[in-house]
Regions:
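A glycine- and charged-residue-rich anion-binding loop/surface
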Residues: 1-215
Length: 215
């Protein structure tokens, strides 16, 4: 995105978000959400997060990255899911990322023609991941909020955080972000220990099933 950083100088603006091509993406999110940049600090943060993450998302998918649980695919998945959650914070209750991606492609397609060539594929990847995450986020957030309400207001138990991940598929990084917003914490070290124990149990179960297959 070096061209847009150069545009900061050419257009005489102090922030990447004030460059016209980037501002148009933010305006698209504002239009969908019915919110305006400058309404509040929380609104501005969410608008910036979505704008930043959808730009990165579109470029990564165009480069051949797909959402997964490891490597660059995990980074992409986190970007997409964090943007979707900030959409929820803005009151957006329908799939919207593909619409915003269209604006990214429109604004950047001249400099990056491959975005236009691959736009159908880009939309498909985004739509599939957003649909998958929407099934998780609403129920997960409701359960997390219940657990926060029942806590001491300072720390969520690692066992609760792990249950959200293991049983409901709610990502730990999203749990940590919600807790931070509430001024709370959880033990990542204890969460990782529980995760490792679960993986070890799964390995043992697979081994037992394999042994049974030879009997």
């Amino acid at each position: 995105m070096g061209l847009e950083r150069l545009a900061c100088v050419v257009q005489g603006v102090g922030s990447l978000f004030d460059v016209d091509t980037v501002r148009n993406i933010t305006n698209k999110v504002s239009e969908i959400a019915g919110k305006h940049y400058g309404d509040s600090d929380k609104t501005d943060i969410s608008l910036r997060v979505i704008t930043d993450h959808i730009r990165s998302t579109v470029m990564m998918i165009c480069d051949g990255v797909i959402p997964s649980n490891e490597g660059r695919g995990y980074v992409l998945r986190r970007l997409l899911r964090r943007a979707v959650r900030h959409g929820k914070l803005l009151g957006i209750d329908k799939p919207f990322m593909s619409d915003v991606a269209s604006t990214v492609i429109k604004e950047s397609g001249g400099a990056y023609p491959e975005l236009v060539e691959k736009q159908k594929y880009i939309h498909k990847v985004i739509e599939n991941e957003e649909a998958s995450f929407n099934k998780t986020i609403d129920s997960g957030l409701a359960i997390l909020n219940d657990k926060i309400a029942a806590s001491d207001g300072k720390e969520l138990s690692a066992a609760d955080a792990f249950q959200l991940y293991d049983t409901y598929g709610f990502p730990i990084d999203l749990t940590l972000e919600v807790l931070e917003e509430q001024g709370m914490t959880t033990s990542r070290e204890e969460f990782d220990r529980l995760m490792n124990e679960q993986r070890e149990r799964a390995r043992e179960d697979r081994k037992k099933m394999g042994d049974l297959g030879w009997q």
